[in-house]
Amino acid sequence: FDIIADPNLKPKSIHVSCFDSAPLSVDFEFILKDNIDLFKIGLDALEILCPDNLNLGLKKSQKFLINELSDYNFTVFDGPHPSGNVGVQIHHINPINSGDVVWIIKPEDIITIGSFLKTGEFCPNRTIAVSGPPVNNPMYFKTRVGAKLNSILNHINFNDNCLLYTSDAAD
């Protein structure tokens, strides 16, 4: 994991976890609802790279995504963390053997691919959750990859001076 995909190696499969089961994480269904068309464009491009082996992991409660993505290969998961972990999902869907090449990609990266294919512009946008006990006003922020944390954190009302900032879902 966390290895850049080698474009010269054909993957056995591509996996996308469309939910994060970690506490205080972003709700991907919330993000995908506003970007479902771009997400589908990105999925269609990935299916060209790995026909019949693009696997989406969906959560049982994601009724919108289950309905919208019915034309794609998905597996529904239910249960506590780490059910949203893509490695756990790969283990259940299509286990990795020695020498296998699989790719994993996050939903927002697929939106970025779809947006690029539709507009020709690279827009690496992200929606992040600012949450947890020290946050008086938990909320989502739309930002870009590489944005300075201060541009976001200056808008948050914290109730504690002892804070831990994590990037992604701290997995």
Model-derived segments and their meaning:
Residues 1-167:
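Buried, small/hydrophobic-residue-enriched core segments of structured protein domains
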Residues 170-171:
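N-terminal low-complexity segments that are often proline-rich with Ser/Thr-Pro
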